[in-house]
Each structure stands twice: as C-alpha cells, then as structure tokens.
C-alpha cells in the first residue's frame, strides 16, 4: 500500500511486523470468532491452548526470518552495545485468554518474535507508529489503510472474501 515512510538516517536494523491469525497462522480461530462470536472464540482458544494452529501463508517467511534473528542474537550476546540487525514483531488483535495458543503455535513452529504485542482488539496504528517496522503484513485491509508505514495486505482465508 502507498506510504510516506522515511527511514531514519543511521538506522541499521531491519524491523518486520506480522499480524498473527491469517498471516503467520491459519485463520481457523478467526473463522470461529466471525461465525460464533467472541465468547465461543475465547472458549475454544482456552480449550485448545496446547494445540497449535495450522500454518498460515507467511509462516515459512516468518520462520526463516526468526532463524536469522536467533543467529543475530547469538552473534551479539556478549556485547552489551550490540544493535540487532533484525527484529521481528507480532502485532495482533488477540488478547487474554487467547495468548497461550499463539505462544503454543510459535513454539511448535520453532519461531521466536523479539516483540509480541497483544492488543485485545485495540487499534494497531499506535503500536506500529512507535515500532516503526520497515514492513507490516496483515490480512485485514482495515488494519492497513491508515498506517503511515509500508504495509502488505495478505489476501487469505475468511478475510479475503
């Protein structure tokens, strides 16, 4: 999507942000939420908190970037002044009590995010404006339209219809 994003001079790190459901993970939880409402969604997430969600369309990309992030963190672990070369964030509308299934899913894929923002339905824009990712991936246009950061719509699943 068009943007007026300007990278800061001297900024050497790469920041990438992902939505979770319908992007990193499949959209089975989103389908439950849209078809049966918040209460049914939350109960299912509690009941299945130890069962990972299916992979989403960008799971492979997220996983590979996560491995690079781990290698980079290992490289700088003994240097207190080390600036990470890559930082991955998950910025999701999820909140309590559905966070455990998100964590279970990330662990099952062997993935790691440097930052995890569980917004519990709050707007993503304020977090993204502070985080300033170089790119943000989301499956819902409403989360991207007012952003001033480079964003990519992932047309996947129930939200692409």
Predicted regions and their residues:
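Alpha-helical substrate-recognition element adjacent to the catalytic core
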Residues: 9-12, 17-118
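Asp-based, Mg2+/Mn2+-dependent phosphohydrolase catalytic module
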Residues: 1-16, 20-47, 129-130, 135, ...
């Amino acid at each position: 999507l068009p943007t007026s994003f300007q990278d800061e001079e001297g900024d050497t790190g790469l920041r990438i942000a992902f939505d979770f459901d319908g992007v990193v993970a499949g959209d089975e939880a989103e389908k439950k939420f849209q078809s049966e409402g918040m209460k049914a969604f939350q109960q299912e997430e509690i009941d299945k908190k130890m069962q990972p969600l299916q992979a989403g369309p960008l799971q492979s990309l997220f996983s590979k970037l996560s491995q690079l992030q781990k290698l980079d963190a290992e490289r700088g672990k003994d240097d207190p002044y080390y600036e990470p070369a890559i930082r991955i964030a998950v910025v999701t509308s999820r909140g309590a009590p559905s966070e455990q299934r998100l964590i279970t899913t990330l662990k099952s894929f062997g993935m790691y995010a440097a930052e995890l923002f569980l917004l519990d339905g709050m707007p993503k824009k304020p977090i993204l404006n502070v985080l300033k990712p170089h790119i943000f991936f989301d499956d819902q246009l409403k989360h991207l339209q007012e952003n001033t950061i480079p964003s990519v719509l992932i047309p996947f699943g129930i939200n692409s219809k």
